[in-house]
């Protein structure tokens, strides 16, 4: 089997994780207590969904997941929620005091007390796998736990499981909406380690997802639950080919191979279509061509940046439901003729497609309509750099005055780490610039030494 272990860190990671596991259970017909009436082979490990669930002798299905937070309130919601019987109590790890939005607390003082316990639990999960293929890491980089403990865990995973791929689902700070003043610091410090220790990072941003909920689902005041259910559809589409059988299956390592041209350029945009409410879906015929087009709409992107300002390097389309390869090829051919969707000149083909026959599931009482087919797009576009330059700008404004820095230094960080991380991000912005540049400038000479 090719198992995946999910690691959910901090409030964002845990709440997105809740939405994901709820959706996985619905898609596989697993009840909240872990029983699966449709599964005839008790304890048999060869079903496709066993990549994400392990089976006990009693026929209970347990998620291969760890939830970690430095304070108990968010994890207590899992411990008392509808799916409390699904998770093994050892998989829910919570500390006593939180990271207080401080990267240094999550990474150095408080985080290092809990990280060995987490690694121990992850080790137990991985011993339970026959062929672990990688980790899915869910966190946000604006807070303290997601950024600090998240980076610490990723660094330790690189040491313990060097060759295994790590896929990150990372919530980045939004341009207008902010949950804490020191978001720019935490984001820059933690992106510094994401650059080194994740193989593919999929950027999400609350504001972009708010706008999608408002525009496409007519929810006037979206809550985190609305956002997370939308995010979980994307993640479910990505992992569908690991959990079900399909025509063109895609492995976690395949994302990496097809989307990452250079090791540092691994921050992806994602979009999902159709995002449509039940009353509208009734009146629309959502053909493959239509959903493919809307996946490329700038307004469908789940991070606030405009792909028309950059060029695509590669793009991965994961279809699910009633889709045949012929329609996909036709839709992709149409996309290629569009002038607004530009690819870099050194990557002429640029599309990887996957098809999965399992139609998208929906949470009962959720906002999304039940549809016959859906597509999720993960793309590597140079426009992602907008996300970083925005954060860098805010970082510079604060750091010029050394505002709030004493909180970090007081927890055992050195000021040098700020400038080191900031330089790394400046280099990343430069990398994106060079990748998007045309080849005729003869720039490729100096890139040869770098990689």
Curated annotation (Swiss-Prot):
Instruction: Cite the Gene3D superfamilies for this sequence.
Output: Helix hairpin bin, Tubulin/FtsZ, C-terminal domain, Tubulin/FtsZ, GTPase domain
- Coiled coil spans: none
Q: Which reaction does it catalyse?
A: GTP + H2O = GDP + phosphate + H(+)
State the InterPro entries in the record: Alpha_tubulin, Tub_FtsZ_C, Tubulin, Tubulin/FtsZ-like_C, Tubulin/FtsZ_2-layer-sand-dom, Tubulin/FtsZ_GTPase_sf, Tubulin_C, Tubulin_CS
Spell out the protein name for this chain: Tubulin alpha-2 chain
Q: Which gene is this protein's source?
A: TUBA2
| Active-site residues, record numbering mapped to chain | 254
Keyword Aminoacyl-tRNA synthetase listed: no
Cite the GO molecular-function annotations of the record: GTP binding; hydrolase activity; metal ion binding; structural constituent of cytoskeleton
* Primary location class: cytoplasm
This protein's record includes keyword Cell membrane: no
The similarity comment for this entry is: Belongs to the tubulin family.
Quaternary structure note? Dimer of alpha and beta chains. A typical microtubule is a hollow water-filled tube with an outer diameter of 25 nm and an inner diameter of 15 nM. Alpha-beta heterodimers associate head-to-tail to form protofilaments running lengthwise along the microtubule wall with the beta-tubulin subunit facing the microtubule plus end conferring a structural polarity. Microtubules usually have 13 protofilaments but different protofilament numbers can be found in some organisms and specialized cells.
Identify residues that carry N6-acetyllysine.
40
Q: Which cofactor does it need?
A: Mg(2+)
Show the PROSITE patterns listed in the entry.
TUBULIN
Q: Which residues bind GTP?
A: 11, 71, 144-145, 179, 206, 228
- Transmembrane region(s): none
Organism ancestry: Eukaryota, Viridiplantae, Streptophyta, Embryophyta, Tracheophyta
Identify which top EC class this enzyme belongs to: hydrolase
Annotated binding of Mg(2+), by residue: 71
């Amino acid at each position: 089997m090719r198992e995946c272990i999910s690691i959910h860190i901090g409030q964002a990671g845990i709440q997105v994780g809740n939405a994901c596991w709820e959706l996985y259970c619905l898609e596989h017909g697993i009840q909240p207590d872990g029983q699966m009436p449709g599964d005839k082979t008790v304890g048999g490990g060869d079903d496709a969904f066993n990549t994400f669930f392990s089976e006990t002798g009693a026929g209970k299905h347990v998620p291969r997941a760890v939830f970690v937070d430095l304070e108990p309130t968010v994890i207590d919601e899992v411990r008392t929620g509808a799916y409390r019987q699904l998770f093994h109590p050892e998989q829910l790890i919570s500390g006593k005091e939180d990271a207080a939005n401080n990267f240094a607390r999550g990474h150095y003082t408080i985080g290092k007390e809990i990280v060995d316990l987490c690694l121990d639990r992850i080790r137990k999960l991985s011993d339970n796998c026959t062929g672990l293929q990688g980790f899915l890491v869910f966190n946000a980089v604006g807070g303290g736990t997601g950024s600090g403990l998240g980076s610490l865990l990723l660094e330790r995973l690189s040491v313990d499981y060097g060759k295994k791929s790590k896929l990150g689902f990372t919530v980045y700070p939004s341009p207008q909406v902010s949950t804490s003043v020191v978001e720019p610091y935490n984001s820059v410090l933690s992106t510094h380690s994401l650059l080194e220790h994740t193989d593919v990072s999929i950027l999400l941003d609350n504001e972009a997802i708010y706008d999608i909920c408002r525009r496409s689902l007519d929810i006037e005041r979206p809550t985190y639950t609305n956002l997370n259910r939308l995010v979980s559809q994307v993640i479910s589409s990505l992992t569908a080919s690991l959990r079900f059988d399909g025509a063109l299956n895609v492995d976690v390592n395949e994302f990496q191979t097809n989307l990452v041209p250079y090791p540092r350029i691994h921050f992806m945009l994602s979009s999902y279509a159709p995002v449509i409410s039940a009353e509208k879906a009734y009146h629309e015929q959502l053909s493959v061509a239509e959903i493919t087009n809307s996946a490329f709409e700038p307004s469908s992107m789940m991070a606030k940046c405009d792909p028309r300002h950059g060029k695509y390097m590669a793009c991965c389309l994961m279809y699910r439901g009633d889709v045949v390869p012929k329609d996909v090829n036709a839709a992709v051919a149409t996309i290629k003729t569009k002038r607004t969707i530009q690819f870099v000149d050194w990557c002429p083909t640029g599309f990887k497609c996957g098809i999965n026959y399992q139609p998208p599931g929906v949470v009962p009482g959720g906002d999304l309509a039940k549809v016959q087919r859906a597509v999720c797009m993960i793309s590597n576009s140079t426009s992602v750099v907008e996300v970083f330059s925005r954060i860098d700008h805010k970082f510079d404004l604060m750091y010029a005055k050394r505002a709030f820095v004493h909180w970090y230094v007081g927890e055992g960080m050195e000021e040098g780490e700020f400038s080191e991380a900031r330089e790394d991000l400046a280099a990343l912005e430069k990398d994106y610039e060079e990748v998007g540049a045309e080849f005729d400038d003869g720039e490729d000479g100096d890139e040869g030494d770098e990689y």
